[in-house]
């Protein structure tokens, strides 16, 4: 599996693209504030999911990047609230994007609570030579031995 196959990534990418399209309609004066911020945070959700999955051989890094992704997802929701309050998006769009945002948050939290289902093997990480070799073999082949 590759990170693009992860449901959290797919859903996060989908909402980031929807936000991009919606934000094209924001006023020009918001270009370097709300528009830039909401695009950046929504894209960062996916970037952090990708990084966490690629670095899943390091359990702490996996966890750290997923918590960063969750924080970016919350930031995106905050920007959606501002866009709605400023009347840049209508209520229907706000509700749809909010529901999708919540779903992405749940998927990220599922990954955080179930790291083994995503290939994180914490039993490998004791400081000895055998595990160091195994860790580097996993990185080289991009697969975890069964």
Predicted regions and their residues:
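Short, C-terminally biased terminal segments at protein or domain edges
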Residues: 1-48, 55-146
């Amino acid at each position: 599996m590759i990170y693009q196959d992860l449901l959290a990534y797919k859903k996060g990418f989908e909402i980031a693209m929807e936000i991009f399209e919606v934000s094209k309609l924001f006023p020009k004066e918001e270009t370097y504030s709300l528009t830039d911020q909401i695009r950046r945070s929504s894209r960062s959700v996916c970037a952090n999911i990708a990084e966490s999955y690629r670095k899943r051989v390091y359990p702490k890094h996996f966890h750290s990047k997923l918590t960063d992704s969750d924080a970016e997802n919350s930031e995106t929701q905050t920007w959606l609230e501002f866009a709605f309050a400023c009347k840049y998006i209508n209520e229907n769009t706000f509700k749809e994007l909010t529901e999708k945002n919540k779903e992405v948050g749940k998927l990220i939290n599922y990954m955080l609570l179930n790291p083994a289902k995503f290939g994180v093997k914490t039993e490998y990480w004791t400081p000895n030579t055998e595990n160091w070799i195994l860790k580097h073999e996993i990185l080289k082949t991009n697969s975890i031995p069964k």
